[in-house]
């Protein structure tokens, strides 16, 4: 009789996670007196968002320097060494009595977006997986911890933290359950100047 022993073939599996969305985190020191004065001097529309959409050159101009330094570090980390523009920035208010949270949204016509958190216990920020698949292996895929299986991630920021992420990532500000208003500055960034090479060269300029 022939040898009927089952042969076991070992298959070596390796893994490399490609095309991740880069998220960047940092901290900014906040001057409490300037912060209070700036919030008081900002006109908030409908109790939600500032009327001024260039607030880092307005009532919060003292924060432009530290925010821009963080932006420079992020852009250089992604190998964009040329000029850039923080072309929009605004104050966002999350207030309990409004009893609403933001709609799912992304930031159109922008490269990177960011948020600087100004007050204690900021509202969580939920991000949605930008990859196109929507299969999930089980209920745990809906939690906040999985990096590959999950299609959502909830970021719990702290006062003074600053975050930047690709503008195409859908996200949603969660509701405020505390009695105190929560404030943050959101902003959008574009690389400017000459980008690309050969037939892909483009010159970007932000006109305000």
Where are these predicted regions, by residue range?
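Non-heme Fe(II)/2-oxoglutarate
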Residues: 5-82, 90, 101, 201-208
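Extracellular-facing segments of soluble proteins and assemblies that are Gly/Ser/Thr-biased and enriched
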Residues: 82-98, 107
């Amino acid at each position: 009789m022939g040898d009927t022993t089952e042969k076991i073939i070992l298959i070596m599996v390796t893994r490399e996670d490609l095309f991740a969305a880069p998220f960047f985190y940092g901290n900014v020191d906040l001057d409490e007196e300037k912060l209070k004065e700036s919030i008081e001097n900002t006109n908030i529309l409908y109790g939600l968002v500032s009327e001024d959409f260039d607030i880092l050159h307005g009532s919060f101009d003292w924060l432009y320097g530290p925010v821009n330094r963080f932006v420079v570090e992020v852009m250089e980390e992604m190998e964009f060494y040329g000029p850039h523009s923080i072309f929009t920035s605004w104050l966002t208010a999350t207030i309990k009595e409004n009893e609403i949270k933001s709609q799912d949204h992304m930031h159109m016509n922008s490269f990177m977006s960011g948020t600087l958190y100004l007050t204690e216990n900021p509202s969580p920020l939920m991000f949605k997986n930008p990859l196109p698949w929507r299969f999930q292996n089980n209920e745990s895929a809906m939690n906040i911890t999985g990096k590959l299986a999950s299609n959502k991630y909830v970021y719990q920021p702290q006062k003074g933290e600053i975050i930047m992420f690709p503008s195409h990532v859908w996200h949603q500000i969660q509701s405020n359950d505390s009695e105190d208003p929560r404030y943050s500055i959101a902003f959008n960034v574009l690389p400017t100047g000459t980008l690309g090479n050969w037939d892909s060269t483009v010159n970007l300029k932000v006109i305000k």
